[in-house]
Amino acid sequence: MKSLFDFDEAFGRNMEEGELNGITSLKIKVRTRIKFEDKTKRQNIQKLITELPVPGESIHIVSNGSFDYFTVIPHIIELAGEKVTDFWFSTWTLSIMNVTAMLDLYDRGVFANINALTGDYMKSRESNVYNLLLTGCQKRGQRISSNKNHSKVTLLEIGTDRFIIEGSANFTANPRIEQFILSNHDGLFQFHRGWMDKILTKYAQ
């Protein structure tokens, strides 16, 4: 049967399978219990997330831009009541305030490590913020890489829990409607950790 679409012409580049930007395209299928939360009228993160997902559960959330996406992280840590033994994140760009907060969490022992992936946009257009993150990670012996990255994923290993945050927001304070999924799932955690580690192993700066 003839295809209804010429993907190369209709949708732009459709390259053959292979490694690009440090990884091959990946997928994972997991079974989780879902909670849906439309929180566009809630005004802060404490009201937005009142309990953490149990293993095998995910919470799907729409927020109204009234809080900084990075503030989800210390709130999760507070609810969990334990320190983060493994911290990974991938984002297009960060604000200087969130870079400072992240390094402070490491210095206070809340984060055992930092594994950071950013977009090359940040490196070229927000060079002062990127350099703060770069030098901060390098001085502390932590890993950072910048490439053609637009993914937004955060991984938090806390005790026996494996929390994953996937969504539309960067680590910035832009007041926008955003969606994200907070999951507690070891398989999904290892899936994202795998491709992040591959990039950082090859291209850490």
Feature names for model-found ranges:
Residues M1-Q205:
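PLD/PLD-like phosphodiesterase catalytic module centered on the HKD motif
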